[in-house]
Amino acid sequence: MTTEYLLRREMEHVLAALTPSNRLVCRVCLQTGLRVGDVVSLKTRDLKGQFWIVEAKTKKRRRVNLPRELLGQIRAQAGEVWAFPGRRPGRHRTRQAVWADVKRAARAFRIKQNVAPHSFRKVY
């Protein structure tokens, strides 16, 4: 099943309904075009305004630019190792946890399209 594009208003509703940490993950997808799996696996030591990443799916190397405001928000909640720590000690947040929260938020606003974290990447 493919994800669909969201109207700006719908995207804002979904973002507002997410937990703060999952909202931040989706904002990174929105601002950078990265896949959710690549975002949640960012390490704290890699957090700079501009950095290189090897995309997990395509194995392509690309440069990522993070706006200062977003970078500051990520650093404020980052763990010792992972930029987006998970519930389990020593692990990063899972893409499935972000996916479930996005689905819940879309249902709360009765959005009919198939919404997933990938929907935010499509806007990039």
List each model region and its residues.
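Flexible interdomain linker/hinge and immediately adjacent N-terminus
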Residues: 1-11, 85-91
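Basic, Lys/Arg-rich DNA-contacting stretches centered on the C-terminal catalytic core
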Residues: 1-2, 9, 17-18, 49-71
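Basic, Lys/Arg- and aromatic-enriched nucleic-acid-binding interface segment
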Residues: 4-36
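Short, leucine-enriched amphipathic alpha-helices that occur as contiguous helical runs
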Residues: 11, 22-23, 95, 99, ...
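Short, basic (Lys/Arg/His-rich) helix/loop patches that form interaction surfaces
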Residues: 16, 100-123
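Short, charged phosphate-coordinating catalytic segments
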Residues: 29-49
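C-terminal catalytic core of Y-nucleophile DNA break-rejoin enzymes
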Residues: 56-75, 81-103
